[in-house]
């Protein structure tokens, strides 16, 4: 159980401001929460293994394989117009000017 002064200190540290009529409600709710935490702390959990996953599924892993990631030749095969060759050489898309 916490005191009313402790509840006010917690509210101040959390930068919470309450009207006078809601301070009592905050104190009651915080007291209830702290009582629930005390009940949970009474449970003996020292022989219980931590839960690593909610579901017992094994991740399906794939083998890592090194592959070529230079797809620029395939990418620039789709370039059309009179700047096709230049686009393939510099590996940039050449577009009309959009902003003046």
Curated annotation (Swiss-Prot):
It comes from Rickettsia africae (strain ESF-5). This is Aspartyl/glutamyl-tRNA(Asn/Gln) amidotransferase subunit C. Pfam families: GatC (PF02686). GO terms for molecular function: asparaginyl-tRNA synthase (glutamine-hydrolyzing) activity; ATP binding; glutaminyl-tRNA synthase (glutamine-hydrolyzing) activity. PANTHER family: GLUTAMYL-TRNA(GLN) AMIDOTRANSFERASE SUBUNIT C, MITOCHONDRIAL. SUPFAM superfamilies: Glu-tRNAGln amidotransferase C subunit. Its EC number is 6.3.5.-. GO terms for biological process: glutaminyl-tRNAGln biosynthesis via transamidation; regulation of translational fidelity; translation. It catalyses: L-glutamyl-tRNA(Gln) + L-glutamine + ATP + H2O = L-glutaminyl-tRNA(Gln) + L-glutamate + ADP + phosphate + H(+); L-aspartyl-tRNA(Asn) + L-glutamine + ATP + H2O = L-asparaginyl-tRNA(Asn) + L-glutamate + ADP + phosphate + 2 H(+). Belongs to the GatC family. HAMAP family: GatC. Keywords: ATP-binding, Ligase, Nucleotide-binding, Protein biosynthesis. Allows the formation of correctly charged Asn-tRNA(Asn) or Gln-tRNA(Gln) through the transamidation of misacylated Asp-tRNA(Asn) or Glu-tRNA(Gln) in organisms which lack either or both of asparaginyl-tRNA or glutaminyl-tRNA synthetases. The reaction takes place in the presence of glutamine and ATP through an activated phospho-Asp-tRNA(Asn) or phospho-Glu-tRNA(Gln). Heterotrimer of A, B and C subunits.
